[in-house]
Amino acid sequence: MQFFYTPNFNPIILKVGCISFYWYGMMYVLSFIFAMWFLKYRKRYIVNDIFSSTSEIENLLYLNFLGVVIGGRIGYVLFYQWSMLSQDKLWFFKLWEGGMSFHGGLIGVIISIMWFSYCKNQSFLKISDFIVPAVPVGLGLGRLGNFINGELWGRVTFDIPWAMLFKNALLQDLLTLKIHPEWKFFFDYYGALPRHPSQLYEMILEGIVLFVVIYIFSCKSRPEGSISGLFLLLYGLFRIIIEFFRQPDIHIGLINNFITLGQVLSFPMVIFGFIIMYVSYKFK
């Protein structure tokens, strides 16, 4: 029988008394630190006509961070886990347990940029173009955090040598066996069903690849809005592709037995991204 790797990470970095520090939360801290450094670098060497001082960048990042956390959590509750609030009223605040929605976080960031651009009398797209190149690194680190937590695993596969066994997928495995009882032999042998490590797929595509493309594209002067449009377009496409390998949420499943909620939420990103890029180049 083929060997499949079983990730077995402790989600807690260290524990001091009754306080625990989690890898998932650390990914947000690292993302914030990188964004702070990278955007100051962009102001100094690439774009220097938007902010009068680095303190303005810091203020914007604080707003964005709040937008990501609040919007991401609200989005996750509304889109994926509304029922959890009825079981645990404080669950909304347990961010260390995971459970963030990119699309909700995106809405939160958009609102924070709108507020900042209004207060500073700056163009919304000009500011978003400045910020966007720093976003993919945060996305990649977030997916790494998902992998360490053993969540958001992929669909069952027996055809690839890098398939993995996720212990936290036990309930999903048992439900899958009801549909595919012929896989019970593999479940009994491995103790789990081998799955795509879709968190790592997302880390590579939405983190590394997207960062490289957006960074190279943003190093030259571009029409206002084109960088933001390219980000929306590429992220939407990458997410739609990866969703075919990612296990749909257990309580939602496939919509019309074909499409996932993540794909439904990503299609508008592709459309709006294309429109923004088209308009930005047509009227530059």
UniProtKB/Swiss-Prot annotation:
Residue ranges crossing the lipid bilayer per the database entry: 19-39, 60-80, 98-118, 130-150, 199-219, 225-245, 258-278
Function: Catalyzes the transfer of the diacylglyceryl group from phosphatidylglycerol to the sulfhydryl group of the N-terminal cysteine of a prolipoprotein, the first step in the formation of mature lipoproteins.
Family statement: Belongs to the Lgt family.
Coiled coil: none
Protein's name in the database: Phosphatidylglycerol--prolipoprotein diacylglyceryl transferase
Lineage start: Bacteria, Pseudomonadati, Pseudomonadota, Gammaproteobacteria, Enterobacterales
Record: residues binding a 1,2-diacyl-sn-glycero-3-phospho-(1'-sn-glycerol): R143
Organism expressing this protein natively: Blochmanniella floridana
Enzyme Commission code(s) on record: 2.5.1.145
Domain of life: Bacteria
Top EC class, one word: transferase
Keyword Transmembrane helix: yes
InterPro entries tied to this protein: Lgt
Main location: membrane
Pathway: Protein modification; lipoprotein biosynthesis (diacylglyceryl transfer)
